């Protein structure tokens, strides 16, 4: 999945010129058009495989479903809440961002907001412009010794922590993913949220906008906070409940707030913006020359590396895909697709649980990318799932009535000596199991239901294979099968058979084209199927 057919990219928001240049130097056509309406954006995307946006363009499900050629959406920045991830994933469209591009700029703005809240700098400056000299009105507070609560300890959160520690602030925080040991390494003590609220003099949020983070600061949590707490939101509008914040400001429970983001941008309700203890900016978190250049450069390089098959970085909705660009993994992905297609042809649109088992040290962490490849083989022939790919496979397989489990078996000492790795695909509770491996860079089939092929059967993309099981004691069987091929006008290209298992043998014929029907074969064999992947 090297996205080799991605040729044209639309940039629909203002980006640094380096973005266009890098894309063009990488062999891609680039169109730059900003401030497009929904209808105009859909029209422009009809001949584009790629789209790069900042935060202004809203990539909705309507746009995604109408953009027939679209394969990749790139967000030059961190947050992707302006992209409908579910719709993109369902359609098999990759979504990527630049998680590092604006981290420093967002962190520096947050630190500036904290300092402005402590010393009321914007209010004092505005007073001076009005010709006033109000020294007593703008009495501030030192940051030294104050407690800063940081909710979200990713890249931006930790940059804020290290900077504010230099002011003598004590930093505490919460993050459901970052471990306490990791956060302690950059000076943040993690505590449960209910313990954080009453301790903080300042609270800053650095989380994505999710159902679990929407309204994270609300009437209930403000009531638990220390009276006079100051709040900063340079992350996403909606994390702080704006109605609750206004009530806390009016009651004095919250002494001040600094907001760079809002639930609605620009906000039509000006009550918060106009409050004397609120500092507000028009979403400037990433608005520095350095961040814009960095984000534009990073997303362009990610597109070019992806198209050339070098690497896949910044993936939001299919992280496991990054490993398919590893030279070791590519042939295993091809093998997984082949075994999935084999299983679909053999079991006849199976239902239930599909088991994907890896074996061998080099495949220890490969199940997450091989399972979607197996699903592609399983679902590709189903007309309603013809668009299945590595992005949407795990979503579509559930709708097809299948559960997919992955597991790993460590290699035995003997297998470790020989470096043998295996991929097994099986249908739980049914007699369908296929085992394959990679020889050099070539996928091969090793066994079906324990019947081993020696030598293994090559699995070439686009090469039809006919497989059937029959009694090993029937010497007339093979001439009969060859005769049936001739009657159908199909050439036999190669032939292999397995060792005898339970008195029967599996036979594999590489043929020039798929047979129109297997009905003539059924009286002569125990079972038969054909497939091509």
From Swiss-Prot:
NAD(+) binds at residues 78, 155-156, 175, 207, 234-236, 260, 283-286. The modification Phosphothreonine is found at residue 78. It catalyses: (2R)-3-phosphoglycerate + NAD(+) = 3-phosphooxypyruvate + NADH + H(+); (R)-2-hydroxyglutarate + NAD(+) = 2-oxoglutarate + NADH + H(+); (S)-malate + NAD(+) = oxaloacetate + NADH + H(+). Pfam families: 2-Hacid_dh (PF00389), 2-Hacid_dh_C (PF02826), PGDH_inter (PF19304). CDD domains: PGDH_4. There is a cross-link at residue 21 (Glycyl lysine isopeptide (Lys-Gly) (interchain with G-Cter in SUMO2)). PANTHER family: D-3-PHOSPHOGLYCERATE DEHYDROGENASE (PTHR42938:SF22), FORMATE DEHYDROGENASE 1 (PTHR42938). Its EC number is 1.1.1.95, 1.1.1.399, 1.1.1.37. It is an enzyme of class 1 (oxidoreductase). Belongs to the D-isomer specific 2-hydroxyacid dehydrogenase family. Catalyzes the reversible oxidation of 3-phospho-D-glycerate to 3-phosphonooxypyruvate, the first step of the phosphorylated L-serine biosynthesis pathway. Also catalyzes the reversible oxidation of 2-hydroxyglutarate to 2-oxoglutarate and the reversible oxidation of (S)-malate to oxaloacetate. Pathway: Amino-acid biosynthesis; L-serine biosynthesis; L-serine from 3-phospho-D-glycerate: step 1/3. This is D-3-phosphoglycerate dehydrogenase. The modification N-acetylalanine is found at residue 2. The modification N6-acetyllysine is found at residues 21, 58. Homotetramer. It comes from the Eukaryota. It comes from Bos taurus. Keywords: Acetylation, Amino-acid biosynthesis, Isopeptide bond, NAD, Oxidoreductase, Phosphoprotein, Serine biosynthesis, Ubl conjugation. The lineage of its organism: Eukaryota, Metazoa, Chordata, Craniata, Vertebrata. InterPro entries: ASB_dom_sf, D-isomer_2_OHA_DH_cat_dom, D-isomer_DH_CS, D-isomer_DH_CS1, D-isomer_DH_NAD-bd, NAD(P)-bd_dom_sf, PGDH, PGDH_ASB_dom. The keyword NAD applies. The active site is at residues 236, 265, 283. GO terms for molecular function: L-malate dehydrogenase (NAD+) activity; NAD binding; phosphoglycerate dehydrogenase activity. The modification Phosphoserine is found at residue 14.
